[in-house]
Amino acid sequence: MPVRKQDTQRALHLLEEYRSKLSQTEDRQLRSSIERVINIFQSNLFQALIDIQEFYEVTLLDNPKCVDHSKQCEPVQPVTTWEIASLPSTAVTSETLPGSLSPPVEKYRYQDEEVLPPEHISPQVTNEVLGPELVHVSEKNLSEIENVHGFVSHSHISPIKPTEAVPPSSPIVPVTPALPVPAESTVVLPSAPQANPPPVLVNTDSLETPTYVNGTDADYEYEEITLERGNSGLGFSIAGGTDNPHIGDDSSIFITKIITGGAAAQDGRLRVNDCILRVNEADVRDVTHSKAVEALKEAGSIVRLYVKRRKPASEKIMEIKLIKGPKGLGFSIAGGVGNQHIPGDNSIYVTKIIEGGAAHKDGKLQIGDKLLAVNSVCLEEVTHEEAVTALKNTSDFVYLKVAKPTSMYINDGYAPPDITNSSSQSVDNHVSPSSCLGQTPTSPARYSPISKAVLGDDEITREPRKVVLHRGSTGLGFNIVGGEDGEGIFISFILAGGPADLSGELRKGDRIISVNSVDLRAASHEQAAAALKNAGQAVTIVAQYRPEEYSRFEAKIHDLREQMMNSSVSSGSGSLRTSQKRSLYVRALFDYDKTKDSGLPSQGLNFRFGDILHVINASDDEWWQARQVTPDGESDEVGVIPSKRRVEKKERARLKTVKFNSKTRGDKGEIPDDMGSKGLKHVTSNASDSESSYRGQEEYVLSYEPVNQQEVNYTRPVIILGPMKDRVNDDLISEFPDKFGSCVPHTTRPKRDYEVDGRDYHFVTSREQMEKDIQEHKFIEAGQYNNHLYGTSVQSVRAVAEKGKHCILDVSGNAIKRLQIAQLYPISIFIKPKSMENIMEMNKRLTEEQARKTFERAMKLEQEFTEHFTAIVQGDTLEDIYNQVKQIIEEQSGPYIWVPAKEKL
């Protein structure tokens, strides 16, 4: 019985039906096996083999078949050798195509329809069966689709008019080389499609120069997706653009989130990290972020998206035999069902190779390898806990089946970072007998060759060691203490993401012996600070781990601090004088934890940055009485808070040390619990940058800001600053299109043919007029690009606000003050990353260097604009941050809001 493609389609359908019924846990392995069979059925190679078989049995072996029934049938001998060299070929042009393909060939797609019954076949095919004409597809004609060199039968290509919309029911499939056909044979061209072939882009006439993300066109697949806009919009978020690249310097527009229940999620084809090339007929390559957002907003109810995505990396399967040693198997894993290491991928990945372990000694297992099985236990589509259990229950001899990527991860944004991050939601377990395999290590997150979760104090060498650091924008990235009475210089703090942290060679408790051959064993604090300051870019440090000496030093500092705190209370300054009460409302510009302030004269009151406090008694120099003001009203609880004077005095005492970063104001988000005083002068130094400065009494310290309550009759603009702001902005507009919008910017650039004045831009004909308006502060932000001015005007923001929508602004922190001056008080929210690791966890496509720069930019933003922030949010996940932002906007929307008062404290 001949094998036909319809039979394959039917078998595939039955397999998929059966797979959908396997929902029980015990069916997981069977389901996985069936999926492998389905993948084989859907592969291009399998389809090609079916084509060969069908051609051989139906055509070459079918003697009665002939071209013209009026002529005598000539038997066709079985073909055993195909001569490809003798095949005729022509370039694809409108002249070479059959009559049915004669319209201008500008766009191509495969026919993806079932084989039609004879009565539905066109007369041209039934009455005049053409001989096999093979068309050579040149690179020139199809380079935008994919670099194809081969032969494609005419029946596989059909033209589409340039403006014709491809209906959602017609999936796009790729142009692939058809099988070479003998010139002398009669061929009935099959019209049955390939089974679920990978998609290819339609409308390539307007996409002459595709942009690549770390790859060539052959690395990508393309798809056209038609969505119907729902009540909550299209249901996805985007990031990127020429003004704010999402990945490195790539200005492409990326899908960053598929909103559950939205149009995109219900359709099921759009994926996170897809790159949008076009929205309907609007090209969104090399456009600003706002331009892409506008294209999506203006696309109407039926939206055609042309997207590209990276093809899955080919993998090499191999088996590795490991023999457990004292350190176990010696590697860490991450991922699993419900705990994906890579978005959309449930696989188990190797994230760290532990030095000296079995995997390290064997040398075959690498970071980024995917674990498929351990001994006879399958690790595909399992939870993280199941994978850990399988690895834990192995004997001394362990056989690992792994998939190794054949392409280098350096070109892949999904490269698993070499980290062990205890604060990460993605569980990362060490496969070693000494660690609890079901739990995350509790040591601080570190970038280093050997995880600090693996090395105990007894395993760290106590011998002097040489460390070479290269000074970065944050300096050397550590603090020092000591230098009094020859007690030595110790490292007291390692800045996350700084050079010292990234090297992994220095740790808290190290004693610094020398810096660039300058002996610091008997140095004072000032001498050590000067040596570090003047050490240049490359700094050679000889350090020795001395945790016992450092612990004694810490105890001494703690005792001294307690003495000073007690002295402050007993001196009489701790009592509240109530003879001249003064009442006011203030906004807190720092976090306060009453449990960390031992000088409190009575019950204290906790508060966070941005909280509104009603100070009911501000007569005392050191302590005030206050109540918290919530959106629901004023709290009944009265507590004591430090006065403005006390906060500033304590902070200045802490800052009265040698600092190497003249712009650093300390951590303005909170008042640390280790604030010093005169007796602690020069106890801590920060080896952060190049300049030394003593903090005088003029040093600006953030404490409280006086505020008044005001009623507003407009919807407040929203400015979000910090990492992941684009994703949050996009999510707000996508989820609440009726509540959030963007304003139309101004430009002196000439209008293009397809642009509409007032919709795409406000086109300003006079550059002099726009420059004058900028000077008169009519713009909250403006700049120049390609000799054209661009800017966001106060009036544009006001127009959106008066329509009852929050105007989402993608501007700098300077715009906050300008809006306040214009009496448009924005809700300004700063997303404060917890660490470099926190940034990488929320955006796995970032490299360590990109995450470091993002973290540094965030710190600089906080230093410059803290006093202008309405609120500061932190979270372990983007979802957590997004929910906090929504709550803050809801609470701060008005109509009664707190605005800065003109009076001074």
UniProtKB/Swiss-Prot annotation:
Phosphoserine carried by residues: S122, S138, S158, S232, S568, S573, S575, S579, S598, S619, S685, S688, S835
Domain PDZ: from-to ranges: 224-311, 319-406, 466-547
Region (Disordered): 420-449, 663-694
Cellular localisation: Cell membrane; Basolateral cell membrane; Endoplasmic reticulum membrane; Postsynaptic density
PTM note: Phosphorylated by MAPK12. Phosphorylation of Ser-232 regulates association with GRIN2A.
Alphabetized PROSITE patterns for the sequence: GUANYLATE_KINASE_1 (PS00856), GUANYLATE_KINASE_2 (PS50052), L27 (PS51022), PDZ (PS50106), SH3 (PS50002)
Any GO CC annotation of this UniProt entry: lateral plasma membrane
Cross-referenced InterPro entries: DLG1-4_PDZ_assoc (IPR019583), DLG1-like (IPR016313), DLG1_PEST_dom (IPR019590), GK/Ca_channel_bsu (IPR008145), Guanylate_kin-like_dom (IPR008144), Guanylate_kinase_CS (IPR020590), L27_1 (IPR015143), L27_dom (IPR004172)
An example Gene Ontology molecular-function term: L27 domain binding
Coiled-coil boundaries: none
Modified residues (Phosphotyrosine): Y399
Location of the L27 domain: 4-64
Record field: compositional bias (Polar residues): 420-445, 683-694
Described function: Essential multidomain scaffolding protein required for normal development. Recruits channels, receptors and signaling molecules to discrete plasma membrane domains in polarized cells. Promotes epithelial cell layer barrier function via maintaining cell-cell adhesion. May also play a role in adherens junction assembly, signal transduction, cell proliferation, synaptogenesis and lymphocyte activation. Regulates the excitability of cardiac myocytes by modulating the functional expression of Kv4 channels. Functional regulator of Kv1.5 channel.
Stated family: Belongs to the MAGUK family.
UniProt name for this protein: Disks large homolog 1
